[in-house]
């Protein structure tokens, strides 16, 4: 089984061909492809983690959709002053499907 550890959106993700993962928003339109940076490649029994060997390895993903994460609520409160502040946030996300791993 071939899989790779890639850097995507400031995190490290374990991916194989056909996996769909959710990463932080990238400025790529839906249906287009993007390359993810591999940090480690496992090909059967061979494990590659050398940066010079990984320079030729490409992990290609296709953008499936743009999405938003769950809404979180931020509350600020100061005692005895009547100060209250409420704010919401939804993180913009991109769902990608891994199409190929290899040279």
From Swiss-Prot:
Pfam families referenced in this protein's UniProt entry, alphabetically: Ribosomal_L21p
GO-annotated cellular components: cytoplasm; ribonucleoprotein complex; ribosome
Keyword tags: Ribonucleoprotein, Ribosomal protein, RNA-binding, rRNA-binding
A GO BP annotation: translation
InterPro entries: bL21-like, bL21-like_sf, Ribosomal_bL21, Ribosomal_bL21_CS
GO MF term list: rRNA binding; structural constituent of ribosome
UniProt function note: This protein binds to 23S rRNA in the presence of protein L20.
Family classification: Belongs to the bacterial ribosomal protein bL21 family.
Quaternary data: Part of the 50S ribosomal subunit. Contacts protein L20.
Annotated protein name in UniProt: Large ribosomal subunit protein bL21
Taxonomic source organism: Kineococcus radiotolerans (strain ATCC BAA-149 / DSM 14245 / SRS30216)
Species lineage: Bacteria, Bacillati, Actinomycetota, Actinomycetes, Kineosporiales
């Amino acid at each position: 089984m071939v899989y790779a550890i890639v850097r995507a959106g400031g995190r490290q993700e374990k991916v194989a061909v056909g996996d769909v993962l959710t990463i932080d928003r990238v400025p790529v339109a839906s249906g287009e492809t993007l390359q993810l940076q591999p940090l480690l490649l496992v090909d059967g029994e061979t494990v590659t983690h050398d940066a010079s060997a990984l320079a030729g390895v490409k992990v290609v993903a296709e953008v499936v959709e743009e999405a938003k994460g769950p809404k979180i609520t931020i509350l600020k409160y100061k005692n005895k002053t009547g100060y209250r502040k409420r704010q919401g946030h939804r993180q913009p996300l991109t769902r990608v499907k891994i199409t190929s791993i290899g040279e």
